Regions:
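Short, surface-exposed tryptophan/glycine-enriched loops
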Residues: 583-602, 697-709
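C-terminal substrate/ligand-recognition segments
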Residues: 221, 226, 655-660, 671-680
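Short beta-strand elements bearing conserved aromatic residues within extracellular beta-rich modules
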Residues: 564-566, 680-682
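Extracellular beta-strand-rich recognition modules
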Residues: 601-607, 669, 710-716
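Glycine/proline-rich low-complexity spacer/linker segments in large multi-domain proteins
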Residues: 75-85, 608-633, 717-759
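Catalytic and substrate-binding clefts that recognize carbohydrates or anionic sugar/phosphate headgroups
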Residues: 82-150
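Short beta-strand segments within Ig-like beta-sandwich modules, predominantly Fibronectin type-III
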Residues: 689-693
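Carbohydrate-binding surfaces of carbohydrate-active enzymes
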Residues: 3-22, 33-40, 45-85, 90-102, ...
């Protein structure tokens, strides 16, 4: 069975059939055998043109040859329903809103616009209009089926719809509106639409939103689902603003009902902020909507691009604990030219990442997570999703902090809960919010504290007996459990009366006894650098240049983005057309200068249009770099270290080997590395002992090596993150930003705190 990891593969530039085959081959070799073809900014092929469909054919044919699966995406960028502006060219197909408060009450606007930080002003499609939706399907779904119908249900598994919504034009004081809504209102409620509107009837907002919700479901969701079913594939994707219950209703109507109508319902968990106040609310929603085909989550899109594998794994298992078994990885870039358009966040599941080989291990973890998602658990409490109160207040901002606080407290106290809507289960108490946002349990008003006290479970505590936030436990009906360290500090915690050690972002499926008998390994390592170091030269805001200098005389080159001009100390550099060490997907967009010497005197590199994740200029060479951020940014370079001592940490980029001669003690069964987060491989006398992407980093030793002097080689890989330099400084100081995504940590460090023999 194929891995449940599915890359959202950004189709950018003008890839050839060979480019596509090579790209998919790279994914396949690294544990990924499902891709979603993702039309995105940076694509130079006209969307839905014959050239476009030729590229899609190349994807499908290559996937077939490699035994991979393909998912389609139903628009260009997001949100879905417009076919890259083709639908809204017809004014009758544009989303409408009606003013329900203040001046011009009752005015219907068919020319509403929504300002997008990324895409500017645009119209949005009316997904309550069946004719508009039929036109959208004819432009996209039908065109794909016309050309590739014989692959539907085999190579092609489904079509992804991204953030469709009826709320894009409904700012405060407005509601979604469709033609002849007033007729449906009269039929449904026996009252006049405009009489209730003008008299400010307390039921008007709720009633109107119910109609809009039903129309959205009938005209868009049900229609797409029916089309997909009849063509042998799945309709998947997610709705807008699904992380907050109120806004999920404001933008989509009856959120849980509409999401449940997807064949493979999904959520958008792109921030990977494991301490986010809305995370548990988001996961509870998809768990409710899950179908027999499963559920999906779009994950990791905001990065950072140097996110640890431990955090990725933890997010996969947290998703699985809420019955999610398809993991769409955002984004996999064929090349990074899309960063010219979507500039301020970057995540990459592709071979441009030096540590991409670790995806093979994450893929195996994902398969375990998928099986975990099949398990059920019994709730200690049911929580009625706040659909009604959200519908009543859909024309204004509304704060449901009390709900988020409750869900988080329950989750970290080990109290299991599930959403319900209209159901009346009897196997656990039911809690709901009244119109004043009071928590009502068994007919009585309660505080969060009193609810916790009544439902108290054995919470996970620290060694002082204090309840700990950030540790999540799921107890399944089959008697098994999962413990996840979402954001608590690494250390020992009391679980069921025993002290258990949890690493940062630990995933604990079974009780794991850590080694107690160990001995420190003392040696010095030779350092072998497998690639040149690469780091950006940042020119932020009004700055036109950056500087570089060196403690010792060094030879360096500069990478210059092909669409920019740079000068080095006032002169245009000479290019070397036969050398380019930049990673695949990046090298295509940069020229490399000929080698030159750099000394202690600063040289000035003038360049323009520097972008956060597509630098105008980078320096390349055999050096270590001290990044200096300020009004004028730069780098101070020094020789790379040739020897490494245990306990040191050092910044660099790419792949590094640490080599030493050691004598294996009698009785040693393993080697333990402490204090790293990197993808790490360990070799003993030239043979691979193992590879790890998460703690514990423990590698086995065969007894045949006892008492022998052997070569110990430790290989570590960084992410792509180090080449982008101090992006935290960029985020804090950039004057112009489209949208600040999750910042990079800028803290990739090679090395370890300790290395121990295990007995």
């Amino acid at each position: 069975m194929k891995s449940p990891l599915i890359t959202m593969s950004a189709l950018v530039g003008k890839p050839t059939d060979k480019d596509i085959f090579n790209y998919l081959t790279d994914l396949k070799q690294n544990g990924i055998d499902q891709v979603m073809i993702y039309p995105r900014s940076g694509c130079l092929i006209e969307y839905l043109s014959e050239e476009w469909f030729c590229a899609i054919r190349d994807f499908i044919k290559s996937a077939e040859a490699l035994d991979m699966s393909v998912w389609l995406y139903d628009d260009f960028n997001w949100p879905s329903g417009d076919a890259c502006g083709k639908v809204t060219k017809n004014e009758d197909f544009r989303l409408k809103s009606i003013k329900i408060e203040g001046e011009d009450i009752g005015k219907v606007s068919s020319k509403s616009k929504h300002n997008s930080d990324i895409f500017g002003e645009k119209f949005f499609p009316d997904l309550m209009n069946p004719k508009a939706v039929d036109y959208f399907i004819s432009l996209t779904h039908e065109e794909y089926y016309k050309r590739f119908g014989n692959y539907f249900g085999t190579i092609i598994k489904g079509i992804f719809t991204d953030e469709p919504s009826i709320g894009y034009c409904s700012q405060n004081g407005y509601l979604p509106y469709y033609d002849e809504m007033e007729i449906d209102y009269k039929d449904a409620y026996g009252k006049d639409f405009f009489d209730d509107l003008l008299s400010h009837s307390e039921d008007f907002c709720r009633n109107a939103m119910k109609l809009a919700s039903a129309k959205f479901k009938e005209a868009y969701i049900d229609k797409l689902s029916s089309w997909c079913k009849s063509h042998g594939i799945l309709m998947t994707g997610h709705l807008m603003c699904d992380n907050e219950p109120f806004y999920s209703v404001r933008y989509n109507g009856d959120f849980l009902k509409n999401l449940s109508a997807f064949d493979l319902p999904g959520i958008d968990e792109i921030a990977t902020c494991l301490e986010d106040r809305t995370l548990m609310a988001l996961l509870g929603g998809i768990e409710y909507a899950r179908k027999e085909k499963g559920a999906m989550a779009e994950l990791f899109a905001l990065g950072p691009c140097d996110m640890s594998y431990a955090k990725k794994k933890c997010m996969l298992y947290l998703s699985a604990c809420h019955k999610i078994d398809h993991y769409f990885l955002a984004i996999s870039h064929m090349d990074i030219s899309g960063n010219m358009h979507v500039c301020d966040y970057f995540s990459d599941f592709a071979v441009a990442q030096p540590d991409f080989g670790g995806m093979r291990l994450l893929s195996e973890d994902a398969k375990i997570a998928r099986e975990l998602a099949k398990k059920d658990y019994s709730p200690d409490l049911y929580i009625r999703f706040p659909t009604d109160i959200s519908l009543k207040n859909a024309s204004r901002d509304f704060d449901l902090t009390v709900l988020f606080s409750l869900l988080n407290e329950l989750s970290y106290r080990g109290i299991q809960w599930k959403y319900i809507c209209g159901e009346m289960p009897t196997d656990a108490p039911i809690l709901e919010l009244d119109d004043s946002l009071q928590l009502i349990l068994n007919g009585n008003a309660e505080s969060i504290e009193s609810i916790i006290s009544m439902l108290d479970k054995k919470a996970i505590t620290d060694t002082y007996g204090e309840c700990v936030k950030g540790i999540f436990r799921r107890r399944f009906n089959d008697g098994t459990a999962v413990i996840l360290n979402l954001y608590a500090p690494e250390g020992g915690y009391v679980i069921d009366g025993e002290i258990v050690y949890l690493y940062e972002h630990s995933v604990l499926l079974n009780k794991c006894d850590l080694p107690t008998k160990k001995e420190a390994l003392h040696c010095s390592f030779k350092v072998n650098y497998c690639n040149p170091n690469i780091v950006r030269l940042m020119t932020l805001n009004d700055s036109k240049g950056a500087f570089a200098c060196a403690d010792d005389e060094l030879n360096v080159r500069f990478a210059t983005r092909k669409d920019t001009e740079i000068k080095i100390d006032g002169a245009c550099p000479e290019l070397d057309l036969n050398y380019n060490p930049l990673p695949k997907g990046i090298c295509e967009h940069y020229n490399i200068t000929k080698e030159q010497s750099i000394k202690s005197e600063k040289i000035i590199i003038e360049c323009q249009n520097d972008l956060k994740y597509m630098p105008s200029a980078m320096v390349i060479g055999d050096f270590s770099a001290n990044i200096i951020s300020g009004d004028t940014c730069g780098v101070n370079l020094a020789k790379r270290k040739g020897a490494y001592n245990i306990g040191e940490k050092f910044a660099d980029f790419g792949k590094i080997e640490l080599l030493a001669r050691v004598r294996v003690p009698q009785g040693a069964v393993g080697i333990e590395l402490l204090g790293t987060k990197l993808y790490t491989m360990l070799y003993l006398e030239g043979n691979l002992s193992g590879e790890k992407i998460t703690a514990p980093y423990i590698f086995n030793i065969e007894k045949e090596l006892w008492g022998k002097d052997i070569e110990l080689k430790i290989v570590q890989f960084s992410s792509i993150g180090p080449i982008f330099g101090d992006v935290d400084y960029w985020d804090k100081n950039a004057k112009h930003s489209q949208w600040r995504g999750t910042p990079s940590t800028s803290e990739t460090h090679f090395g370890f705190d300790e290395i121990n023999w295990i007995y």
